[in-house]
């Protein structure tokens, strides 16, 4: 069994959990800045923070069928793009409406990542490692939340509109996630069930667990 390779691809995919946690928590440090900049009422502030859930619902509902049709890997790549766009647009937003739209886009990424990342890991991980590797995603969510708080702390005293840096810094790990996903194979289970590409799936399974596992 190529344990290191299996852990490697699982860790990359689980970075979606990190972005999920980071995106969920980072807004806490930016609340003061966005309230002043966009001149928000209490209702507008609450909606701008909570609107992510609407995107997450949409992402969660659509990610499953899309991943069944186009593959887990492609949907995860799309979530990475959504995280990158959301972080960048949120940081550059000049109006309340576009800020909310950017936040909802990030929510779609959250809804997709929280569903598809553990599915992918479960489909590539050997039975002996499956439980611990799937839990990587949950661990990364907690790490992402923690990193967001530390990031906000170190960026809060920057001159000018520090909230833009707080929200925009997420684009860096999101783009890294986007690039890293191209190094992971497509789900062997999906390749067989959807495309009947037994030979292609077999190559991945051999790389993960050897010929006996395949």
Labelled PLM ranges:
Residues 1-214:
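Transmembrane-helix signature of 12-pass secondary carriers
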């Amino acid at each position: 069994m190529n344990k290191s390779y299996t852990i490697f691809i699982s860790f990359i995919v689980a970075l979606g959990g990190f972005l999920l946690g980071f995106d969920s928590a980072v807004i806490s440090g930016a609340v003061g800045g966005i309230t002043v900049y966009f001149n928000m009422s209490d209702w507008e502030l609450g909606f701008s923070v909570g609107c992510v859930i609407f995107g997450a619902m949409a992402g969660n509902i659509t990610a499953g069928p899309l991943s069944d049709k186009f593959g887990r890997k492609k949907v995860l790549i799309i979530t990475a793009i959504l995280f990158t766009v959301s972080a960048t647009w949120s940081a550059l937003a000049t109006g309340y409406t576009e800020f909310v739209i950017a936040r909802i886009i990030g929510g779609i990424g959250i809804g997709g990542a929280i569903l598809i990342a553990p599915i992918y890991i479960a489909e590539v991980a050997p039975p002996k490692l499956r439980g611990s590797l799937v839990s990587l995603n949950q661990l990364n969510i907690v790490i992402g939340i923690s990193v967001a708080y530390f990031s906000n702390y170190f960026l809060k005293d920057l001159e000018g509109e520090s909230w833009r840096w707080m929200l925009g810094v997420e684009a860096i790990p999101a783009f890294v996630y986007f690039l890293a996903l191209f190094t992971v194979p497509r789900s062997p289970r999906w390749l067989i069930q959807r495309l009947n590409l037994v030979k292609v799936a077999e190559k991945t399974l051999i790389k993960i667990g050897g010929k006996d596992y395949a």
